Amino acid sequence: MKQLFATTSRGFEELLKVELTELGAQEAKVVQGGVHYQADDETLYRTLLWSRLASRILFPLIETKIYSDLDLYAAVSGFNWLGLFDERVTFFVDFNGTNQEIRHTQFGAMRVKDGIVDYFERQGKARPDVDKIQPDVRIHAYLNRENLVISLDLSGEALHLRGYREDAGQAPLRETLAAAIVLRSGWQVGSPLVDPMCGSGTLLIEAAQMEAKIAPQLYRLHWGFDFWKAHNQSAWEKVKNEAIELAEEKQREIQPHFYGFDLDHRVLKKAQKNAQNAGVSHLIKWQQGDVAALKNPRLNEVGTVICNPPYGERLGTTPALIALYSVFGQRLKKEFCGWNVSVFSSESTLLDCLRMRASRQFKAKNGPLDCVQKNYQVSERKSDEITAENELEFNRTSEVATDFANRLQKNIKKISKWAKQQGLDAYRLYDADLPEYNLAVDRYADYIVVQEYAAPKNIDENKARQRLLDAVTATLHVTGVETNKLILKVRQKQKGTNQYEKLANKGEYFYVNEYGAQLWVNLTDYLDTGLFLDHRLTRKMIGALAKGKDFLNLFAYTGSATVHAALGGAKSTTTVDMSNTYLNWAEQNLILNDIEGKQHKLIQADCLQWLEKCDRQFDLIFVDPPTFSNSKRMEDSWDVQRDHVKLMRNLKRVLSNNGTIVFSNNKRGFKMNLVALEELGLSAVEISHKTLPLDFERNKQIHNCWMIQHI
């Protein structure tokens, strides 16, 4: 009997023990990260060929304590490697673990390699070559404190590499993990299995191979024991031939009852190819389809729905995921009454959107992600009862979620009517009206943007996350917007250039209407959309004041105020901003509104430096500086409270005798230094109340606005 060790992912050790025991292993003992067991030659090969959960199967050679790299070298160089393989083979060393003496795994691997090749030289043999790509022999070393175990890796390549997956989707499951999910799902061999978001098909393929009695390594060509001198070829051939015969016999008995659905036809083609390589293509029916229209393919039977849907670190955006999980739960309760359901995800809060109570749950790792697998039993109820429940479901999230939905609905009724009368299709529907829901909801034509303000540090992260899920679910329901047209952003206090930080690179622009102006917006690539909605009335006022005047737009952002000034009949416009991105955006806004000519200048510059050097005058100036900035492209930091008087001194110099400055900023509690302005010869009148539109009247501190003129 040989002493062996099978490694596996953490959390799967007990499952692996059961599997190995069923394959004939003796004295199986669970430890963290694997299972020790004993096996004769046939059982050894059987576990290699048939284990669906083991990552590697190791044959320990050296177990000792080491206290230095010299001890490591001595232990390795003193072993009888010629009894294991000859000098003509290639080898590679996998080294795992460190201690105070062996601080780097590469150093540990090098010392093991040195010990092996030096042993062969001392025996008068040639030095065996190292091959990192496809070695004939793989040596596995594990160091835990002073405890060293060196083993022969009988697997060769890791056992999760079944050989059937030529291609995969964007976020494939490792095959060993997929097998564990199937085994934990409660699925019974012989019953239907449905994966509504199957991706490259790994879950279904693993299950189909289980039912078809196809050994997971049946098609493997290279093994870690191929050049092992103790390899028992006759025992291996017996075990492999038994597996081939069993697979051929079983395949004739099975009827297809595996079903894979996915929205992406391209990934379905990959799944079909993978199933063909795995020998189970005739057992699985593939169909392109949206989970929102999911139908039960086996109405008269009871089976299992198994799924690894997208989650935060995988694919999609959060609003789409919330909607996806919500509609998935609805379809399950409508179409799969009495069925078992097993869902694997890294987002426990997303699983809450299913609105189902789990009967069992298991923790697991998917790479670096902490994940959970939850099993559910769908109750047996009539479909009309389920439909009625789904209609009211969003109201059940919590009492506050109902309040949020009601408030949003009330605001929509009031604001949408007003916006239509004003000729607006970009406006705010909700702005942290309820303290429990600290977010803003904006409409941009057919799109909804939900901006989540950062939660205070004393608010539990999971609680805040759940409230956000509830709010997005309610927003989808109340507005009726399509899930791909709801954009979610997390807004935090901006520091320096963070306000201009790029979030994505989709490049998706469309225009909205504002008092006769058309303005480009981008809802995904930046934290801001290109249009400050709270300044809408300010821009309208600028348009009304601009006729026949030379207009300056300083800190211009995307130039929306310039558009209004030009449409209002400005004699000339000068638009200044430090960002090339936003200046190009401003240019496109001008083009969109047929505003062209040399009298409309766009200048990329540090606004403060440009202003100091400016030698012309303007009749109307709009300046909307940031609250704070420390951009590397600016010589000094900027603080609107600290520096606004200096700014006004420079603006006064370029302001014509009868000119007007419209000055605005977003600093809460901003105090205009009226005494200092008077000393400069300027008078300032606050007009904030006149520039707050209806959709922002609930937040009177969102900005402050001033009209400034020569005394």
Curated annotation (Swiss-Prot):
It is an enzyme of class 2 (transferase). Its main location: cytoplasm. Belongs to the methyltransferase superfamily. RlmKL family. GO terms for molecular function: 23S rRNA (guanine(2445)-N(2))-methyltransferase activity; RNA binding; rRNA (guanine-N7-)-methyltransferase activity. It comes from Haemophilus influenzae (strain 86-028NP). PROSITE patterns: THUMP (PS51165), UPF0020 (PS01261). HAMAP family: 23SrRNA_methyltr_KL (MF_01858). The keyword Plastid does not apply. This is Ribosomal RNA large subunit methyltransferase K/L. Residues 43-154 form the THUMP domain. It catalyses: guanosine(2445) in 23S rRNA + S-adenosyl-L-methionine = N(2)-methylguanosine(2445) in 23S rRNA + S-adenosyl-L-homocysteine + H(+); guanosine(2069) in 23S rRNA + S-adenosyl-L-methionine = N(2)-methylguanosine(2069) in 23S rRNA + S-adenosyl-L-homocysteine + H(+). Keywords: Cytoplasm, Methyltransferase, RNA-binding, rRNA processing, S-adenosyl-L-methionine, Transferase.
